[in-house]
Amino acid sequence: MGGNVLPIHYDPKTVKQLTKEITVASCIGAAQGALFSIASALLLRRFSSVYRNVRTQVRVFYHCSWISMGAVFRADKQLLKFQTNYYREEQKRREKIMDEAAERGLFLEDESLNSSRSTT
């Protein structure tokens, strides 16, 4: 079968852009999670006798949990934004191709608009 044909979203440029956006979003989310964990830990230390008496490992786990949760949530949100923008651009590209074909008097079906990349 056609093992050398890849969908358009496997384009190295698209993957590189997505990787960059997710990395930046993860770092921002991790920083936000760290700020929240530090602020909440200070409040817990002040007002909670249970938190004051837990071991260091539990406190480290608490901070790591908030940092990783912030990174994951922010990265997921950025992925959804990227996906929305990607599909919007793809729809614009398809509409442009259809308009150009209509001006030339050509008939195109939707299947012919799907961009595929050949790896050869």
UniProtKB/Swiss-Prot annotation:
GO terms for cellular component: membrane
PANTHER family: AGR244WP
Protein origin, superkingdom: Eukaryota
Membrane disposition: Single-pass membrane protein
Statement: the UniProt record of this protein carries the keyword Nucleotide-binding: no
Organism for this UniProt entry: Saccharomyces cerevisiae (strain ATCC 204508 / S288c)
Keyword Transmembrane helix: yes
Residues that span the membrane, as ranges: 22-44
Swiss-Prot/TrEMBL keywords: Glycoprotein, Membrane, Transmembrane, Transmembrane helix
Disulfide pairings: none
Positions glycosylated per UniProt: 114
Name of this protein: Uncharacterized protein YBR255C-A
Compartments reported by the entry: Membrane
InterPro entries in the cross-refs: Rcf3 (IPR038882)
